[in-house]
A protein has these predicted regions:
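Helix-loop junctions and terminal segments of transmembrane helices
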Residues: 75-99, 166-171
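Interfacial transmembrane-helix starts/ends
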Residues: 32, 101-117, 125-129, 146-149
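Interfacial/gating helices of multi-pass transporter permease domains
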Residues: 27-34, 38, 55-75, 143-146, ...
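Helix-terminus/linker motif at the lipid-water interface of multi-pass membrane proteins
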Residues: 46-77, 95, 132-138
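Interhelical loop/hinge segments that connect adjacent transmembrane helices in multipass membrane
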Residues: 6-49, 92-106, 227-232
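Membrane-interface junctions at transmembrane-helix termini in multi-pass inner-membrane proteins
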Residues: 154-181
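Hydrophobic alpha-helical transmembrane segments
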Residues: 1-15, 72, 184-188, 202-226
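Interfacial segments at transmembrane-helix termini and the short loops linking adjacent helices
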Residues: 128-160, 203
Length: 232
């Protein structure tokens, strides 16, 4: 396998005529810092998404934990929709940001409205069909999972509220703001999740996750406004 891998890369290097170039220590250090900021942002994102379930495991039995996890998996899948929107327009948004700020704002706001409409509709459908969605996945009616899903159904919509902020951070390469915002959000989520899980179990954690999306929107907005004033 190693030999095949090496041969494969040799062929690519020769075919594409790739040349080795010495990179300065300064550039290596700069890229390392940038990538490290993305890395810690990703870690914070995983903490925000999966940390709650780990906390809940300390306060409920395995049956309740499994029923909660079933509903959360559906909500997490739905939460990918705002991420798909961000990835889909990022390249075009970056070009518009460099060349035409007015068109950039118009384009991003237009996609933002579309995203809000779609995620809101998804939330309504998930609430209305929650009983049958759980039955389809579990093979039986699980009232607890159904109720949890109804609470978590609007997480994609609330996550979409942060769409504009995320696009602005990414196109302007404000990696330090992204790292700070994700970790502030993660820490607040851990606090809310611990309190909610301790007093109300899965229901408390569900509400904590919903509140975390609202907190995330506020944190990103405040940091962007503060950064704008500092640069003015």
């Amino acid at each position: 396998a190693l030999v095949v891998y090496i041969v494969f890369w040799i062929i690519i290097y020769k075919k594409e005529k790739i040349k080795w170039v010495w990179v300065s220590i300064h550039n290596i250090k700069k890229r390392f810092i940038e990538n490290f900021q993305f890395f810690i942002s990703s870690v914070a994102g995983h903490v925000s998404i999966h940390g709650g379930l780990i906390i809940l495991a300390n306060f409920v039995n395995n049956t309740i934990l499994g029923e909660f996890a079933l509903a959360q998996k559906i909500a997490l899948l739905m939460r990918m929709v705002p991420i798909f929107f961000t990835q889909a327009i990022l390249q075009k948004a970056s070009i518009l940001f460099e060349n035409n700020k007015i068109e950039f704002n118009s384009y991003v706001n237009r996609i933002f409205i579309i995203g809000l409409s779609i995620t809101f509709g998804m939330g309504l459908i998930a609430i209305i069909l929650s009983k049958w969605i759980i039955f389809l996945l579990a093979g039986s009616y699980v009232i607890y999972s159904e109720t949890i899903l109804k609470i978590l159904a609007f997480i994609p919509f609330l996550s979409m509220l942060n769409f504009n902020n995320m696009i602005k951070i990414l196109v302007d390469e404000k990696k330090h703001l992204l790292a700070r915002a994700t970790w502030i959000t993660a820490i607040i989520m851990l606090i809310l999740a611990t309190i909610g899980s301790y007093y109300y179990g899965g229901y408390g954690l569900s509400i904590a996750l919903v509140l975390t999306e609202i907190v995330s929107f506020i944190v990103y907005s405040v940091l962007l406004i503060k950064n704008k004033h500092e640069r003015a």
